[in-house]
Amino acid sequence: MCSPASPKILYRNPRFLRLAFLQLHHQQQSDVFCDVLLQAEGEAVPAHCCILSACSPFFTERLERERPAQGGKVVLELGGLKISTLRKLVDFLYTSEMEVSQEEAQDVLSAARQLRVSELESLQLEGGKLVKAPQGRRLNRECLQPTSAAPISARVVTPSHHPHTPLPTNQTPCPLGAIRLKSLGKEEGPQENNRQNADNLSGTLLLKRKARACPTPQEKNSSPSSHSQEPRENKNDTALDPTVLSPPSLYPSVDKHLLPRKIRLSRSKPSPGICTSKPSSILSGSSSVPATPGRRLWRQRSVNKETPEDKPKPGRASPLQSTPNPSGLGKTGGSRKRSPEVRAPNSDSAEEGQVGRVKLRKIVNGTCWEVVQETPLKNTQDSPQIPDPGGDFQEPSGTQPFSSNEQEMSPTRTELCQDSPMCTKLQDILVSASHSPDHPVVKSEFESSPELVEKEPMLAIDCREPYAFDTALLEQPCEAEEYRITSAAATSELEEILDFMLCGSDIEPPIGSLESPGAEGCRTPTYHLTETGKNWIEGEEWCLPDMELWPRELTELEKEPAGENRGPTELLSPLVMPSEVSEVLSVGGRWTPDLEITSSQPLDGQEDKLLHVSSLDTPQRSYGDLSPPCSNWVETGLEVSLTTDELLYPSPKAGKEVSGHSELLGSLPASSEEEEIDVVDWTAEGRLVPTTVPSVWPDPSSESETEVDILT
C-alpha cells in the first residue's frame, strides 16, 4: 500500500481504443462473434449488438426487447434502407470514418437520423462538406418520424445461417427507420390485423346508436393474441387502446349525408331487460298499408334514468296504495322541484278508485310547461259526473298522444276532427271507459275465436306469462325515411300546432298545418291489431318496460265474472275495423276482459289520418252508461273522474308495471325543436297513478284550483 504522498502515474493510449475498434471492425466484416444481422433490400450486414447499442439509442431499444439466444442471432429488418447506405453507416460505427459521394451523403444522413446515430444526425451537407449544424433550439425529432413507417421485425435465426444469403423476394421493404420485431417461426398475421384495426379506427368512431349500447366481448379484448405474440412491438402500435380496435362489422353503416336532415325529437330505446326476455308474445299488426316516405314519427322518450329512491318496489305494494313514482322527472335532471303534496305518501287514502286531475299549462314566458294538480271531487264516488260534450276541449293532432300504450304502438300522428262535436264525445268515450287494475299483464295477442272477433274484440289477457318482447322486431328504419322533412318546415309546423294549443278552443287551426307531411298522396300507416304473428309494419321502434306477475290477483282475475263488464262493453265499438284509410287508436293501460275502445270520425281531406268509430251514433249515447255503478268500481277496476272542463285518462292500478307505466311517459313535441315536456300524473293521496300521458288543455278559466308547479 502506497503512501498518500507518493505520486500517481497516469498512462493514456488513444491508439489502443482505435486499435480495439479496428479489431472489432475486422470481426464484423468476417462475421466473427456477430450476434445481430441488419437486413435491407434482401441482403444482410452482420454486426455486434454491443456496438450498435452503444452508438444508437434506436438499436438499444430494439435489441433489449429481443436478446439473442446462446449461439443465435437477432435479425433486424431495416425497411427502406439501401444496402450500400447501411454498410457505410455500420463502417462508421466501427471506424468513425466514412467516405461517401454527395448523393450518398444525403442517404447516410437520412438513415442516421432514422437510426438516431448521434454523431451523424447533427451533421448537414454544406458546400460539398459535412459540417456540424449550429446548436440552438432543436426540435424533438421523434415527433417528426413518419407515422406510416412499418416497424422493424426481429427474429432469432440459427447460427449456421449465412449472413449474406439473400432474403426471399416476396418480402416487401418497410419504410425507413421502422422496426418490426419478429420471432422465428411466427407470422405477421396478428400484427397486420392490428394495423388494419388501426386503419379502421376512424370508421369505427363514426358509428352510433344501438351498437354502442351493448359492447361485445370482442370489443373488450379485441387483440390479446397480437399483444402476446408481439410483446416487443413498436410503441406507436402499442399506444392504440385495444378496446378501441373493435371489428367494424359489428356496427351498422351510417349514411352521413342523410343525418343533418333529421329533426331532433326524443326517441325511445329498448331497455336491456326487454332484449333479454323470452318472446312469449309479440305485438301483432297489419302490414297491409305500405310505408310512406313522407310521414313523421313523434318519438316518445323513455324515462330510464330514475333515482333509486324514486323507483318503487311494485312487488309489495297494495293495489290502490303505493308511494309516488316521479319517473317523469328523472330524465330531465334534478333541477325540478316537487311540491309537498306530491311528496306526501298515502296522506289521504280514504277515497279509493279515484284519480286526481292533471292539467298542462303553458307559462307566459314560453320557456316551460307547468303541471297543475287538482284534488278529486268528493261526489265522484257517489255520482260520477258527466262531462259537457260541448266543452272547449279539443286535441290538436300529433301534439298530445292519448296514452303511453298508443304512443308506443302507433308512433304516427293521430289526427282528430277539430270542428266536430264528435271529437269531444269521442275523447269522453275513450276516457270514461276505464281500465281494470286487476290485469297486471297485457299480452298483445288476439284470440282468433269468432266470438271475440265478431262480437267483442278485445285484448286477450294471458296472466300466466310475463310480457316479453321480440327484439327481432326492433329493426330501426332508416333515418332518412323517418325524418324526410326539412328543419324549417317542421319548425313552422310545430309552431302552428302549439299556437293552436295555447290560443284556446275558439280558433280553428289551419287544416294543412295539422296534417302530416304525407298529405301529398301519402298515407299514414294503419295499425290493425288483428291476429298473432303479424309484426308491426316498418319495424317501428318503441319500448316497453319490464312486466311483473301478481299471482294473487291473477287468481282473482280468472274467477272474476265477465258479466260485470258487459254493460260498458256493449256501447263500445270494435277495436278492429276493416277500413282502407283508417288508423286504429288503441287506448293504453290495462283493459277489462271485454272492454275495448275505438272511434272514428271522417273529415274531408283527412280520411287517412282519422280515428275510426265503427258506429256513428256515439253522440246519442248516454255518458252515464259508460261508467259502471260505483259499487263495481273496485271489482271491475274502473277508475273514472270526469269533470265538465277537464278530461283525465283512466289510470291502471298502482304498483304494477305495464306498457302504459309512467316510466314510459313520453315527451310532447313543443315549438322549438329541442323542447321537451314531461307530464306526470299524481293523485291527491300521494300514491302513484301510472297514467297515460293526459291530453289536458291549458285551462284559460280563472276558477280557483290547487296548482302545483312541477317545473322550475
UniProtKB/Swiss-Prot annotation:
Residues 277-288 have a biased composition (Low complexity). Keywords: Differentiation, Nucleus, Phosphoprotein, Spermatogenesis, Transcription, Transcription regulation. It comes from the Eukaryota. GO terms for biological process: cell differentiation; male meiosis I; piRNA transcription; positive regulation of transcription elongation by RNA polymerase II; spermatogenesis; transposable element silencing. Residues 34-102 form the BTB domain. PROSITE patterns: BTB (PS50097). The modification Phosphoserine is found at S420, S671, S672. It is found in: Nucleus. Gene3D superfamilies: Potassium Channel Kv1.1, Chain A. SMART domains: BTB. One of its GO terms (cellular component) is nucleus. Residues 702-712 have a biased composition (Acidic residues). Residues 229-238, 303-313 have a biased composition (Basic and acidic residues). Specifically required during spermatogenesis to promote expression of piRNA precursors. The piRNA metabolic process mediates the repression of transposable elements during meiosis by forming complexes composed of piRNAs and Piwi proteins and governs the methylation and subsequent repression of transposons, which is essential for the germline integrity. Acts by facilitating transcription elongation at piRNA loci during pachytene. This is BTB/POZ domain-containing protein 18.
